[in-house]
A protein has these predicted regions:
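Bacterial Sec-dependent N-terminal signal peptides
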Residues: 16-42
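Low-complexity, Ser/Thr/Pro/Gly-enriched N-terminal "stalk/linker" regions
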Residues: 32-135, 180-200, 255-262
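C-terminal capping/lid segments that line or modulate ligand- or cofactor-binding pockets
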Residues: 99, 144-158, 280-298, 329, ...
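Mobile, glycine-rich extracellular loop/lid and propeptide segments
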Residues: 104-110, 145-165, 171-189
């Protein structure tokens, strides 16, 4: 039986198995048909299709009835909105009705969890922020990893959803107040004249992670740069209200991110005031990929090519599946796709296929890992 035929024959079983299974991501999918030895097919199109179908089904399986998307398949999984956002963005690369249903249900859940200016955990909260939760009962400790990136990546979801159809735009119009609040939350983390932030107030256009952790990270700011672009587009479609000069904030943020480049080290500071070492995988080296990944600096820019080449010199085996930390870090494959590195992306997707075709996931495989891989496939399959 050909690979594409196997996909068609097993997708329904995959989805049902995922929905019923409560084990971790390493064993959520059924084994392949008998006789399949799990070796990679030479036809990358079929390999892409298989992995795409497999990971899409996995992401869908993580959604709770409330619309929340769990980090992974265990019953008591954490629910980290930031991770879910990359999974949702991946579904939007294939805007079928089933995928759009998952996206809408997730967006509705996120809207329902927007914090006000005061919560039981924080009397001075940033309105429009969202806490992390825990399945199965969606309890929270009133904490988040960041405010800036959660908001920015959600705004990117919103604009990509709006670009699907007029019906999607109309649905978003009914949530204009929520989208405006999310935009405000992102803007409130930016060091600019309209804000007074804890720590440094340099009016440099860089965002801090949140008020309890006023660090200006390169990764977060690259995502905020994307979020500002999304907010500008949303505003042009009448989907948000804001008095902030988004274009000016974008220009300042872009200039300051580019200013984090350290000529003496041939890399970007991973945060303002913090130099990076090519010997440290996270956050130093991984951060180098983010300016080009999120369009702050074009992939064709010499600096983008330089840091990408240096990353691969320092961590040369990522495309074979080697993990340099606790997680697979498929954002590397996503960045490689943006850089047009088809050879390495093909190698990594083939590695994942070798697991998926045996009914396995890579260790510590989260929703964001599946999402970033699908985003990489969407870019590179046409190159």
């Amino acid at each position: 039986m050909g690979l594409c035929s196997k996909i068609t024959a097993t997708l329904a079983a995959i989805s049902m198995s995922l929905a019923l299974c409560s084990c971790d991501s390493s064993s959520t999918l059924p084994p392949p048909n008998k006789g399949d030895n799990g070796s990679a097919e030479s036809d990358m199109t079929e390999i892409y299709d298989y992995v795409r179908s497999y990971q899409t089904a996995y992401i869908r399986s993580l959604q709770l009835p409330s619309g929340a998307i769990k980090d992974k398949g265990v019953d008591n999984s954490k629910i980290t909105p930031y991770f879910a956002h990359f999974a949702v963005l991946a579904l939007l690369t294939e805007p079928t009705e089933p995928n759009l249903s998952v996206v809408k249900n997730y967006m509705s859940w996120y809207f329902s969890k927007l914090n006000g200016s005061s919560t039981e955990y924080n009397s001075n909260e940033i309105a429009g922020s969202v806490y992390d939760y825990f399945a199965p009962n969606e309890t929270t400790k009133g904490t988040y990893d960041s405010v800036d990136s959660y908001a920015a990546t959600f705004l990117e979801i919103a604009i990509r959803f709006a670009e699907v159809s007029d019906g999607c735009v109309n649905w978003l119009k009914s949530h204009k107040s929520e989208l405006s609040k999310i935009t405000s939350a992102m803007v409130k983390t930016i060091d600019c004249a309209e804000n007074t932030l804890p720590g440094e107030n340099a009016n440099d256009g860089l965002s801090i992670a949140h008020y309890g952790y006023p660090v200006k990270y390169l990764m977060d700011n690259s995502e905020v740069n994307m979020g500002l672009k999304a907010a500008i587009k949303l505003k042009s479609k009448g989907l948000i209200d804001t008095s902030s000069d988004l274009e000016a904030l974008l220009a300042e943020n872009t200039g300051s991110i580019r200013g984090l480049y350290n000529e003496s080290k041939s890399n970007y500071n991973y945060a303002k005031g913090n130099t990076s070492s090519w010997n440290k995988f996270y956050p130093d080296a991984t951060a180098q990929l983010y300016p080009s990944l999120f369009g702050v600096v074009p992939a064709s820019d010499p600096k983008s090519k330089l840091v990408y080449d240096k990353f691969n010199s320092s961590f040369s085996d990522w495309s074979t599946g080697k993990m340099y930390g606790s997680f697979p870090w498929t954002m590397i494959a996503y960045a490689a796709a943006v850089m047009g590195d088809k050879e390495r992306v093909d190698a990594y997707v083939t590695h994942i296929y070798g697991l998926n075709v045996k009914g396995e996931q890579k260790e510590n495989w989260y929703d964001a890992e599946a999402g970033a891989l699908l985003l990489a496939i969407d870019i590179i399959r046409n190159k």
